[in-house]
Amino acid sequence: MVVLATVLAAGSAQADRLDDIKKAGVLRVAAFDSNPPFGFIDQKSKQIVGLDVDYAKALANKLGVTLELRSTNPANRIPLLTSGKVDFVLANFTITEERAKQLDFSIPYFSSGQQFLAKKGTLSSPDQLNGLRIAADKGTTNEIVLRRDFPKAVVVSFDDTPFAFTALRNGNVQAVTQDGPKLVSLLANLPDKEAYEIPPFTVSNDYMGVGIPKGEARLVAFVNETLLELEGNGKAAAIYDAWFGPNTPQPLPRLFKIGDKK
């Protein structure tokens, strides 16, 4: 049994979630459905697509199983994984020591810095963050960093990024904080994007990994090996270029490669 194997993994044999996935023929993955370009609903196909989804597809293909996506928001990622409702989380999931107490992570497959989106002229340096009303996704490292490092900022938490953007456009907050690449993508799709800007500074650098159930050593090894293989054969670069390459609405140079940080 999966639950029993997980409980016993720390004390004896390895857990066998990898075998369970192969036997079931399905890989269940939690992904965002409203956070482009990492995970969002394609208006034509009505399917979840994005950078994280492409990595999920690559993992499922390597296993030779069907991919089953489950929508999640930032606050629900860990509960979905620890309750056994999904096998992996691929949802712009920042690797932290606190989260690693509850789950395991793969090696990083993406890196970004925490930035801000505000109306032009509102924000130009980190010193100005204290005193502003700033929207953040609930339960994210962005929220944690903001509360810890800028105690005089008024942090307003939302279940998901689109709600934060609505608050910004309605004037309920003065800025939104998120990973830089995600902000670039969201800004590109705003109808009044000329009124907003992303100031050229970061307050932290984050690494994203695949969330994996705690104690599943074989599963971690499989994911890490597959990610390194994708980097080596050029498929990781192709995935990045599909969402951040020169022909996309939000071009960003690829500065981080899988394997740069273990």
Region locations from a protein language model:
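Alpha-to-beta junction loops
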Residues: 27-28, 64-66, 72, 83-91, ...
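Ligand-binding clefts/hinges and TM-proximal coupling segments of bilobed small-molecule sensing domains
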Residues: 145-158, 194, 227-262
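Extended ligand-binding regions for polar small-molecule ligands
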Residues: 53-62, 122, 132-133, 140-141, ...
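Short helix-initiation/N-cap motifs at beta->coil->alpha
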Residues: 53, 68-79, 121, 138, ...
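Short loop->beta-strand "edge-of-pocket" segments that line small-molecule binding or catalytic clefts
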Residues: 25-32, 49, 126-140, 154
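Extracytoplasmic small-molecule ligand-binding "clamshell" domains
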Residues: 15-92
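Acidic, polar ligand-binding/catalytic clefts
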Residues: 57, 61, 66-128, 201-202
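Periplasmic-binding protein-like
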Residues: 110-117, 180, 184-227, 246-262
